[in-house]
């Protein structure tokens, strides 16, 4: 009796060491196709413009063009560091960035923890929708709303203070109030949107741990402290590293719109200084040098924060 040989199954490609790059590309071709729009966006709008940082090392003139402009090396960086305004700009930027990190970063986490305690889904969705809306409001409108509420003569808040104390507070022109106003605006506008990632992380927490903790008599605070926060610790660390990496990127529009002649001594930061020197005064190479300095500091900060996180046996960004 003749034995019929068994038919071999087709080889299954897995993501192991034996699979070739071309085989993996062919297998996942539709997934890679989905990446093309995103890759094109970053290539065209993020990577190609990076050649422009070279004008920081040139005495760039729009009339001569990029290639004919003279190379000056690090002259503009030296001019910036020797500028009397350098330490004032550095102090203002660090102060405002520190306040933003101290108050604006924890705000979404705290709000997400509070929302996580809301049990009725209808209430939770309504609250989430309400707090997401400010993110889509432009800074121009946010500053306009601030003026409506805090202007000395006609502001709603100042009228209330006047009726209670008989005095008015110059929220918008007093230099001492500039930083608190900026931080309050940032918290109001971005806190709701920032809760999305934290809520997504909270959704992955094992509910059986909460049930076991309740049976052991743990209250809400203890459950949050011993279960919730440790479960989302890696998410918090990654977001903190990213925030530290953009420590000096405070945003131009908000600060520029809130700046006036009375609070300029504390309002001038690197972002507004780059605009003033580059756009209003035409010092393109000088302003590019300032922006490049800020970017280099950001890279150092993100690598440093990631290194420290790993030193403490925490999950880093890379």
Swiss-Prot record:
Keyword flag Transport: yes
UniProt keyword terms in alphabetical order: Cell membrane, Membrane, Transmembrane, Transmembrane helix, Transport
Alphabetized Pfam families for the sequence: BPD_transp_1
Gene3D superfamilies (alphabetical): MetI-like (1.10.3720.10)
GO cellular component: plasma membrane
Domain of life: Bacteria
Boundaries of every ABC transmembrane type-1 domain copy: 90-305
InterPro entries named in the record: MetI-like, MetI-like_sf
GO biological process: transmembrane transport
Subcellular locations according to the entry: Cell membrane
Regions that span the bilayer: 35-55, 94-114, 130-150, 182-202, 236-256, 289-309
Membrane topology classification: Multi-pass membrane protein
Family: Belongs to the binding-protein-dependent transport system permease family. MalFG subfamily.
Protein name: Protein LplB
Record organism: Bacillus subtilis (strain 168)
Lineage: Bacteria, Bacillati, Bacillota, Bacilli, Bacillales
